[in-house]
Amino acid sequence: MICFIPTKGRLNTKTYKLFEEAGIEVKHFIEPKEFDLYEVPNKINIQKDNQGISYVRNFMLQYAKENNHQWIIMCDDDINSFYEYRNGKNIKVGADVWINIFQKANQLPFELYGINNKQLIWTAKQDYVINKASVEACILMNVNKIDWNYSKDTKEDKDFALKTIKEGNGIVKFLKIGFSTPTVGSNKGGLHEKYKDKQDYKWAEKMTKKWHPYTKLYKTNKKVDVKINYKAFAKSLNKIIK
């Protein structure tokens, strides 16, 4: 198992240190224009600038296959900690929590394994769900089982989750383990400018049409997003649901 971190505009990223402390190897995937600016270990040049997050995710998948990395953790560059909900409390833990997840995943048939947002782990009624939710920000992937790619200009992680349910066995999400990051779109770098420019609104609309009738566009004063009924989608395909 190895951790892949795509990074852009965040020269001070420290996410890799969480994994180093847990003894998990890390590689950073960086655009050519910023490659020499980063002082992080194990840098990989992704060959093209400004191609978006789907491009780099697909680049990492291909890199993993070409270099015989069956299990990868694909982790955002602004993850700053991990937590577990135990005995009524959020307990800060190390990235070695992914070693525990891997040991379980290695015995299971699914392609994607993810965790919750720290802010939500206290609400979990069960330890995990299967094919009822998407996973994002930090994901364990069984690359050997994946022969589909990320789509461009969409809610790429949710879209990839639906593809995984459709084309593969699906997704396990551990609800009482969580990651912590800055507020989405508030941390300069990454997709920050696209969030500011409201591109995510267009992506939500596009995805709603693509995956109808299992999607619904919803609007609040602050955002437009897509609500997805993963359970109904999985059920329509006779996939495992738990």
Per-region residue spans from a language model:
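C-terminal catalytic/acceptor-binding lobe
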Residues: M1, T7-L11, K152, K158-K242
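Short, well-formed alpha-helical segments that are part of the catalytic scaffolds
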Residues: I2-I24, E34-Y38
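Short, solvent-exposed loop/turn segments at secondary-structure junctions
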Residues: G9-R10, E34-F35, D78-N80, K118-I121, ...
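A short acidic (Asp/Glu
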Residues: K14-Y16, Y38-E39, Y83-R86, T123-V129, ...
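Conserved catalytic core of nucleotide-sugar-dependent glycosyltransferases
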Residues: F82-K163
